[in-house]
Amino acid sequence: MELLIDNRQDRYEITDALIELINKAVEACLIYEGWEIDYEVSLSFVDNQEIQALNHTYRGKDYATDVLSFPLIEENQGLDLEEKLLGDIVISVEKAAEQAKEYNHSFEREMGFLVVHSMFHLMGYDHDHDEATADMRKREEAVLTAINLLR
């Protein structure tokens, strides 16, 4: 598994320990779904201003969000087994820090959750209705528990 990291913010330190945790989270998602772990995922760390611009451009929503997912798997297309790049994850580190404080858990737990959440989007899951949301939450909690990233 290769994680291609682009840190485009300078407000928060992205430590080696955090990168190790993120790698573990990405691999745990693939393993949970029974996928091989030889995929590439692009992960960009940005600030609220940049993610707001991306959110506006790609989703028509003019506010900062925590994470954006850009899967290379088209809906209902399935995975091309020859394609090894799953897609791109963009995380607002600034928003993650705000949410960690708001939810009263660690920054690492919030970053891990956002990566896991986004990975399931890259793997074709969504939360566009109640049943899909419940299914996605179940998967997220299972992976977070497996890597001991509890609330």
UniProtKB/Swiss-Prot annotation:
One of its GO terms (cellular component) is cytoplasm. Its cofactor is Zn(2+). GO terms for molecular function: metalloendopeptidase activity; RNA endonuclease activity; zinc ion binding. Keywords: Cytoplasm, Endonuclease, Hydrolase, Metal-binding, Nuclease, Ribosome biogenesis, rRNA processing, Zinc. InterPro entries: MetalPrtase_cat_dom_sf_prd, YbeY. GO terms for biological process: rRNA processing. Binds 1 zinc ion. Pfam families: YbeY. Its EC number is 3.1.-.-. It is an enzyme of class 3 (hydrolase). Gene3D superfamilies: Metalloproteases ('zincins'), catalytic domain. Single strand-specific metallo-endoribonuclease involved in late-stage 70S ribosome quality control and in maturation of the 3' terminus of the 16S rRNA. HAMAP family: Endoribonucl_YbeY. This is Endoribonuclease YbeY. The gene is ybeY.
